[in-house]
C-alpha cells in the first residue's frame, strides 16, 4: 500500500462545496432518434408513437437494477469507484453475461 492505510486518501477533508447540477428527468436524454436506432438494430421496421415513453421506463428500471447491484459490489469491496468489473458481475448476476471487459 506504499505506506498509506486504506482509510484516508485525501477525500472528505472539507473545503469549498462545488455546485453540482441537480439531476432530474434525465431519462428524456434518451432521445426518440436514439430509441429508433436501437429498434432498427433489432430489426424493427415501424415504430408506434407510444413506444418511446415505454422504452424509457423499461430502460430506467433495467439500469436502476444493474447500478444497484454494481454499487453493492463496490461497497462490499470498500471502494468508492464503480469499476467495469462491478458492472460485469452485476449483469452476470442478472443472467446477462457480458464479454469483453475482463474477468
Curated annotation (Swiss-Prot):
The modification N6-acetyllysine is found at residues 6, 9, 13, 17, 21. Residues 1-20 are annotated as: Disordered. It is found in: Nucleus; Chromosome. GO terms for biological process: nucleosome assembly. The modification N-acetylserine is found at residue 2. Keywords: Acetylation, Chromosome, DNA-binding, Nucleosome core, Nucleus. The keyword Nucleotidyltransferase does not apply. Residues 17-21 bind DNA. One of its GO terms (molecular function) is DNA binding. Its main location: nucleus. It holds the Pfam family CENP-T_C. InterPro entries: CENP-T/H4_C, Histone-fold, Histone_H4, Histone_H4_CS. One of its GO terms (cellular component) is nucleosome. It comes from the Eukaryota. Core component of nucleosome. Nucleosomes wrap and compact DNA into chromatin, limiting DNA accessibility to the cellular machineries which require DNA as a template. Histones thereby play a central role in transcription regulation, DNA repair, DNA replication and chromosomal stability. DNA accessibility is regulated via a complex set of post-translational modifications of histones, also called histone code, and nucleosome remodeling. The nucleosome is a histone octamer containing two molecules each of H2A, H2B, H3 and H4 assembled in one H3-H4 heterotetramer and two H2A-H2B heterodimers. The octamer wraps approximately 147 bp of DNA. Belongs to the histone H4 family. This is Histone H4 variant TH091. The lineage of its organism: Eukaryota, Viridiplantae, Streptophyta, Embryophyta, Tracheophyta.
